[in-house]
Curated annotation (Swiss-Prot), chain B:
This is Increased recombination centers protein 6. GO terms for biological process: vesicle-mediated transport. The lineage of its organism: Eukaryota, Fungi, Dikarya, Ascomycota, Saccharomycotina. Keywords: Chromosomal rearrangement. Belongs to the IRC6 family. Pfam families: Adaptin_binding (PF10199). One of its GO terms (molecular function) is protein-macromolecule adaptor activity. Involved in gross chromosomal rearrangements (GCRs) and telomere healing. It comes from Vanderwaltozyma polyspora (strain ATCC 22028 / DSM 70294 / BCRC 21397 / CBS 2163 / NBRC 10782 / NRRL Y-8283 / UCD 57-17) (Kluyveromyces polysporus).
Amino acid sequence: MTQIKYMLLISRQGKVRLQKWYVSLPNNEKTKIIRNLTSIVLSRKAKMCNIVEFGDHKVVYKRYASLYFVCGITQEVDNELLTLEVIHRFVETMDTYFGNVCELDIIFNFEKAYNILDDMLMCDGSLAESSKKEILNHVKTMDTMEHNDHLDRVLS
Amino acid sequence: MNEDGSVCNKILIAFQDNDQIANLKESVLGEVFRLDKANTNHDENIIKGLTWSTKYYEVRYDLYVDTFDDFEEWCKDLISSEYDDLREVLSGIIVIDSYTMEKDKIDQNKLLGQLGSVLQDKFFVFMNTNKDISQDVIDELNDDNSMQLTSDSGNSVEIINYHNVSNLKLNQYNEKIGFERVREIIDTCEWSGGHRVQTVEAKADSTDVDLESVFNRLKEARLKYLEIEDEDEREQFALEISNEFAEFLQ
């Protein structure tokens, strides 16, 4: 069982590239969390633990090249190692979809990254789909529908 | 702003003035900015009308090339209010100098931090020419909290090794190093203006294109094409259709 509170993708330059909130929080609270987590996570060294206590909850993060994937989790419900696997599965899926994903791919195709994430995690932060193949199939179907829609628009 | 009204970005690159400067200039301008010495005068202080291209966008920029004898003095000048206008128009700064791990390290860090704090939303790269500092030490320096002095403003200096002594292509985090990392930082910086280039959209592996549907749509498109009387309009329609089909079939 997972109940992720939020998923953030922060670059080494401190820029937030993706953010998905699975709990309702006021905007100023979200900004505060992002600001604090950015400085905490970016300053952590390679051999430090990937799990950090943060306020009333825990944060699990993993660095892939110049991108930090950060998840806020519910302490009583979530498993930290499972959260690391969720992050890894998200990265693997994006990697297959984009073909060696990089920061620029995410900046210019952020909606695709959100589509993949939405397929993996439900709106309450629980895991909806763990199969990479299934997720890619869904995203591919959405892409085909989108292209069909473009064609219909041109033909109409 | 250019004559045609488009925004022109500016990057400042500063070298320490020493006997290695000609080599440093040639390799940095060549490797990072892809400026061939045969086509570009590397002695110019302002190289205008350059284009930065990625698979997603193209943007025009000017390169300001500067040199300094004393980094501290140069830094203080750039931080001063006299240079507010210059800093305002810059997309980022690259400094090429030797990083010192000795007693004056704190001052150098402090200077880098001060400069970073006035460069809001702009990239800031320090290219270290000191061969004695290994990639692992550079990674540690970058991870070090003291180097993230400006994280509040969403900006921090990134130290990158000029020399690739170990011949590695990636660091321990699988992150690009050296010139390729500088290019990656510039790729993802916040430019003004620019335009997206036609890209092949990323797509999951798939070979199951519904050919029947493609042919039906082609037929439909041909009928519509024949109905259009105006020749220009017909050509435009044909072009749009061919682009859409090309994208659909990829």
